[in-house]
């Protein structure tokens, strides 16, 4: 039962679903050289999809691409939320420094409630896909909602998006 991942210093990329359904995995520590989560394609999933016990990400302080804050993974500038661990909590307030929710950042997590600040402008591709417990979202200042951003959020019953300019293909597909 895999509980922790500590990668070699040479690790640069983790591909889609590399650790999918490792249900005992609790912590992931990313090394200095790590640079890429391969989740850009419409057919790729979060490398940690289905890791239901995942509590926190940790990043080597010398990494120039990513950093973790309170267990959540962000880009180095902390303007993009990259990945949210499933056991972080079922309610989360997006920090004020975040501008973009990254592709597949919350995919498949058990989050029930997300509080968006007025600084979030974009929700990436499949960012909340398969978040079956998510009930409502208020996308205060979000302008762009990418494809499948909230796809298969089967409990979603209320969405407010007063400033939306672009809603992607299958953004709210059931």
Go through each PLM region and give its residues.
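Consensus positions within tandem repeat domains that build extended binding/scaffold surfaces
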Residues: 15-20, 45-46, 82, 102-105, ...
């Amino acid at each position: 039962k895999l509980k922790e991942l500590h990668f070699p210093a040479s690790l640069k990329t983790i591909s889609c679903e590399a650790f999918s359904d490792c249900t005992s995995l609790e912590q992931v520590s990313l090394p200095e050289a790590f640079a890429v989560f391969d989740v850009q394609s419409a057919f790729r999933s979060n490398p940690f999809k289905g890791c239901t016990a995942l509590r926190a990400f940790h990043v080597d302080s010398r990494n120039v691409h990513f950093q973790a804050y309170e267990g959540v993974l962000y880009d180095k500038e902390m303007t993009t939320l990259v990945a949210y661990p499933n056991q972080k909590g079922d309610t989360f307030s997006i920090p004020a420094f975040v501008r973009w929710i990254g592709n597949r950042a919350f995919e498949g997590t058990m989050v029930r409630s997300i509080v968006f600040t007025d600084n979030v402008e974009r929700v990436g591709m499949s960012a909340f896909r398969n978040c079956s417990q998510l009930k409502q979202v208020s996308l205060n200042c979000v302008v762009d909602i990418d494809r499948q951003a909230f796809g298969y959020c089967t409990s979603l019953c209320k969405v407010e998006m007063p400033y939306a300019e672009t809603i992607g293909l299958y953004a709210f597909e059931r």
